[in-house]
């Protein structure tokens, strides 16, 4: 388990970082080699942010769940993120966080190598992936961890909802209710990431029952295996 200072929401028990599946080796490589199909998987992510604009706003909480290609959970972690002393935390009525909650939390630059290592070789899954991937692209690109113009392979559980479940709305809570997927505290990053992972597994199950051919998530694994735009320091990811 890394010694990195992960910070969690007040009143929530610390979840230890469990052993991760191996990621493609890298020591600050500028062009990582493509990984084999056997090494890929999914990185289900949820971000809580100070607002809606990747260019202007900041990430203040990350929840990440790593899945094998069959959808089984491999590991998960979460942390609060300090956006900087002069940054307003934004809509507390949505994410439930105030400035004092983020005191002492790592900045994104402090955990970026770990985050990128865990994303590498995986298709990024999110509910409203355009939002979360937009923030990842802006934030990690500005830190030099993602090549300019690169399009992160992604799967959007919100876009796929009406193909695989019957739901009156594509909101995460509504989709989970329709799919029978448990959800913890909505807008708590790790709980929402686990909920999105549950939706993906439900879609996989429905797809198998219907005899669907290659679908969005399986094609995304091929894209993830060939994606070479990440850069990270393996030593920094372990400290």
Could you describe each region identified by the protein language model?
Residues 162-164, 227:
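A short, hydrophobic secondary-structure junction motif
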Residues 136, 160, 196-200:
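Buried hydrophobic packing segments
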Residues 2-34, 198-239:
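Acidic two-metal-ion nuclease catalytic site recognized across multiple nuclease folds
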Residues 12-152, 165-187:
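Conserved non-catalytic scaffold segment of RNase H-like nuclease domains
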Residues 116, 135, 194-195, 236:
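Low-complexity, compositionally biased segments
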Residues 188-202:
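Acidic, divalent-metal-coordinating active-site segment for phosphoryl/phosphodiester hydrolysis
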């Amino acid at each position: 388990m890394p010694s990195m200072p992960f910070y969690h929401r007040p009143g929530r028990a610390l979840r230890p970082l469990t052993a991760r599946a191996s990621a493609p080796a890298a020591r600050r490589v500028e062009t990582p080699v493509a990984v084999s199909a056997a090494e890929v998987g999914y990185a289900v992510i949820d971000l809580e942010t100070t607002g809606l604009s990747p260019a202007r706003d900041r990430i203040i909480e990350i929840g990440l769940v790593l899945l094998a290609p069959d959808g089984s959970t491999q590991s998960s972690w979460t942390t609060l993120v300090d956006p900087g002393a002069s940054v307003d935390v934004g809509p507390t009525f949505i994410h439930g966080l105030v400035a004092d909650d983020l005191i002492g939390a790592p900045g994104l630059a402090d955990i970026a190598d770990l985050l990128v290592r865990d994303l590498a070789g995986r298709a990024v899954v999110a509910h409203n992936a355009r939002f979360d991937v937009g923030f990842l692209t802006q934030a990690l690109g500005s830190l030099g961890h993602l090549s300019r113009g690169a399009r992160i392979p992604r799967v959007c559980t919100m876009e796929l909802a009406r193909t695989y479940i019957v739901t009156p709305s594509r909101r995460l809570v509504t989709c989970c209710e329709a799919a029978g997927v448990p959800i913890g505290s909505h807008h708590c990053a790790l709980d929402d990431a686990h909920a999105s992972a549950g939706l993906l597994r439900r879609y996989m199950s429905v797809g198998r029952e219907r005899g669907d051919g290659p679908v969005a998530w399986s094609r995304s694994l091929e894209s993830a295996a060939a994606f070479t735009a990440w850069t990270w320091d393996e030593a920094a990811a372990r400290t």
